[in-house]
Amino acid sequence: MRSPHITISLVFLFFLFLIIQTHQRTIDQTHQIGSNVQHVSDMAVTSPEGKRRERFRVRRPMTTWLKGKMIGANEHGVPSGPNPISNR
């Protein structure tokens, strides 16, 4: 019969090995994915269609968007004064 210390040590080393292997695979996959993404983004930036689209893109300023939201909020007719029902 083996000593419990040896068994526990072997189990611990086995789990440590699994953790290291999993971590190493994750790092390898991350580097692989990162290099692929950079390659795709370089192609997208250098494409002539992308440059044309970016030139004519019009962005609305945030204040216009907020004004539109405020106008939409006033349309539903909520009175701004005191509640006449609660004053009876």
From Swiss-Prot:
One GO term describing the cellular component: apoplast
Glycosylation sites noted in the Swiss-Prot or TrEMBL record: P82
Record GO terms (molecular function): receptor serine/threonine kinase binding
The UniProt record lists the keyword ATP-binding: no
Domain of life, source organism: Eukaryota
A Gene Ontology BP annotation from the UniProt entry: secondary shoot formation
Range of residues in the leader sequence: 1-24
Region feature Disordered, mapped onto this chain: 69-88
Record PTM Hydroxyproline, positions in chain: P79, P82
Keyword NAD among UniProt keywords: no
Protein keywords: Developmental protein, Differentiation, Glycoprotein, Hydroxylation, Secreted, Signal
Family the UniProt entry places it in: Belongs to the CLV3/ESR signal peptide family.
Name of the molecule in the record: CLAVATA3/ESR (CLE)-related protein 42
Organism of this sequence: Arabidopsis thaliana (Mouse-ear cress)
